[in-house]
Amino acid sequence: ASDVFDHQSPNADEVAFAKNVMGYAWGGNQASCTGEVYTIPTAVKQIPGYTDIKYNNELSNKVYCVESPNSIFASDKLSMPFMRYTENNRNAGIVSRREGYRTAVLGFPFETIVSREVRDLLMKQILDFFASEN
């Protein structure tokens, strides 16, 4: 998420794409130290909330370490947070219902979710949201 915003002079087209197409705005780096997030109840019924998720924030031989996760915000009324960092309740994930498509953006790499079962569940929920009519 920070690749677009975290520059001395962010590219205006990239910022507009993130906000107007993807539905998110950057909230800052180093959003969490614990590597723990949770989903929250929203109007998106496919992602019901109350799922605790751990992403890798330590050195590991299985997956790389997330050293500086991002906090992100919904950029408009079409977007909403669906995930927060456990330690401070900053937004860790945003979903968006756009005209003709859906988006989901995380403040950390999806592949660093430690539990395969939780990773599979979240992917299913996101894909169900993408396929939904409402």
Range-by-range predicted roles:
Residues 4, 49, 63-65, 72, ...:
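Residue-level preference for alpha-helix termini and adjacent loops
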Residues 9-32, 75-80, 86-134:
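Extracellular ligand-binding/catalytic regions of CAZymes and related secreted enzymes
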Residues 39, 66-67, 128:
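P/S/T/G-enriched low-complexity
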Residues 42-48, 68, 75, 98, ...:
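Alpha-helix initiation/capping motif
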Residues 52-63, 68-70, 76-84, 92-98:
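Long, C-terminal catalytic modules of enzymes
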